[in-house]
Each structure stands twice: as C-alpha cells, then as structure tokens.
Amino acid sequence: HMHNCCLVNLEDMLQNGTVISETMIDTPKSFSTACNVATQCIAQIASSQYGGQSISLAHLAPFVEVSRQKLRREVRAEMERMHISLSDEQIYEIAEMRVREEINRGVQMIQYQVITLMTTNGQAPFVTVIMYIGEAPEGQTRDDLAMVIEEMLNQRIRGVKNEKGV
C-alpha cells in the first residue's frame, strides 16, 4: 500500500542511524555525510510513496558542529606535522573557513541530488525543505542552522545550470 506525503524524521535517522537498501547507515561523522544520507533517505522514500515529503534543515545543523570539531583536530594535526605553532584562536579560524566550505558542499549535494533524482516509480521527488530558525535551540546549533539556511537560499537564488550550461 502506497503512502501519500510525509514529514521525514531525519533527526532520528541521522542521530540514531537507519537502514537503506538493507545496509545499516551509522550516525554521520560530518555535515556533508549527513547531507548525503538525507538525500539517500529522500530517494528511498520517494520511491515507495506518491506525494511530497518534508525535511528540516534543523535536523542537519547539529552535524555542522561534528564537522567543526573534526576540522579543528585536523587543522591542529596538520600544523603540528609542519611544525607551525598557532594559537587555538588561529586554529579555530582556519577550521571555521573549512566548515563554511563543507556547508557549501553539503548544501550543493542536496540541491543536485534532489533536482536530478529519478525514483523507481518514474517521478522526481517532491521535497519541501523546512528552514525555520526557531526549530534549533539558541546558541551554536542555531547559529549553524542560520549558516546552512543562508547557504541553501544563496544556492537557490544562484540556481543550477541546465543541460546547455545556462
């Protein structure tokens, strides 16, 4: 029996893991991986129902901090390998630039995947992306959600090119 429309519980799938095509998907270790898993969930759900689905960017926002912590460790290790001494503030600043790049890549992945997906029932997924800043608790997670929303809106405004590159 086919379902019509759903609010995808991405938060549960991302925080607790999920199963896609008989494969256990663990909690993502980065924002971009969380975005990829989200698009896989969208594809699977769209292939087994008719009607739209809604996802919330607030469910992806906590993974910005996961990436931030990982990138801080990586920057620190890189600097130590090159015998470059930086303050924590400098390391955080470099890591934050990389966080922004990762947000850009993750959002771009969602954009391209949702636009180009074709489901097994022959239709493109109809996806509503919820961008409600109040859904995240005040503090770093809300600030991260604001960055994700800003990037999503900027990419939507820029649009994507068609097959002719226009």
Task: Locate predicted features.
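Catalytic alpha/beta active-site cores
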Residues: 1-166
